[in-house]
């Protein structure tokens, strides 16, 4: 579970007009909590605190706590509506979860120890094909991210989905056992010399080649 904690207040005013007033006059973010055995609940957050929380990567893929009128709810972020060009959060949808709920989530992939990779040390170029993967697990087992250790990845090596070391209780949502869905996650390849670079290679003029008295090139 993430260490993120947010405080919210319940609200009774509903509708677009009420939401606009919250945003414009009170600098609040309207939101809704739904799911579980409870009824949906309309709430609002401090906009400044929401903006700060959204700077934390784990809020998008982890279970976190919110306190509503003194009562704690365990939730995941289901939807986030932003202003098209202003740094303003317009609305949030949150889903209640219990520790045994089965969740399907996209979680980020972190590539660690790249500076130790033999392939990179040899001048190879890293290609990150995937930066997030979809997993299935109980809420209590939901990781904030999946790590890929690059310390032993060499030149022309490819790390596939089947190579990922998943935490206990966590599964990929795709079946990689038969190889047909075993997509590459990251690879290292030698840098290619472009045709432009080859064309720009200076030629040695004939006058620069030493010759003998007979006009033949010196060996």
Curated annotation (Swiss-Prot):
Biological process (GO), any one: translation
The protein's name in its UniProt record: Large ribosomal subunit protein bL25
CDD domains membership: Ribosomal_L25_TL5_CTC (cd00495)
Organism, as annotated: Legionella pneumophila (strain Corby)
Entry annotated with the keyword Ribosomal protein: yes
InterPro entries linked to this entry: Rbsml_bL25/Gln-tRNA_synth_N, Ribosomal_bL25/Gln-tRNA_synth, Ribosomal_bL25_b-dom, Ribosomal_bL25_C, Ribosomal_bL25_long, Ribosomal_L25_dom, Ribosomal_uL5_bac-type
Keywords, alphabetical: Ribonucleoprotein, Ribosomal protein, RNA-binding, rRNA-binding
GO molecular function: 5S rRNA binding; structural constituent of ribosome
Gene name of the record: rplY
A GO-annotated cellular component: cytosolic large ribosomal subunit
């Amino acid at each position: 579970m993430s260490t993120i904690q947010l405080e919210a207040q319940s609200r009774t005013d509903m509708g677009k007009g009420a939401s606009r007033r919250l945003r414009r006059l009170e600098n609040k973010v309207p939101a809704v909590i739904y799911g579980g055995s409870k009824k949906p609940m309309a709430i609002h957050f401090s906009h400044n605190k929401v903006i700060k929380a959204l700077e934390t990567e784990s809020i998008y893929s982890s279970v976190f706590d919110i306190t509503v009128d003194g009562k704690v709810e365990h939730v995941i972020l289901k939807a986030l509506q932003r202003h098209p060009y202003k740094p303003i959060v317009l609305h949030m949808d949150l889903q209640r979860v219990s520790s045994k709920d089965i969740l399907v989530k996209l979680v980020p992939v972190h590539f660690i120890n790249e500076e130790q990779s033999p392939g990179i040390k040899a001048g190879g170029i890293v290609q990150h094909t995937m930066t997030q993967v979809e997993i299935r697990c109980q809420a209590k087992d939901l990781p904030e991210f999946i790590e890929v250790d690059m310390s032993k990845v060499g030149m022309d090596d490819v790390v596939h989905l089947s190579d990922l070391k998943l935490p206990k209780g966590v599964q990929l949502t795709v079946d990689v056992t038969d190889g047909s869905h075993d997509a590459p996650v990251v690879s290292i390849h030698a840098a290619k010399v472009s045709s432009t670079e080859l064309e720009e290679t200076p030629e040695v003029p004939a006058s620069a080649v030493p010759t003998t008295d007979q006009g033949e090139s010196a060996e």
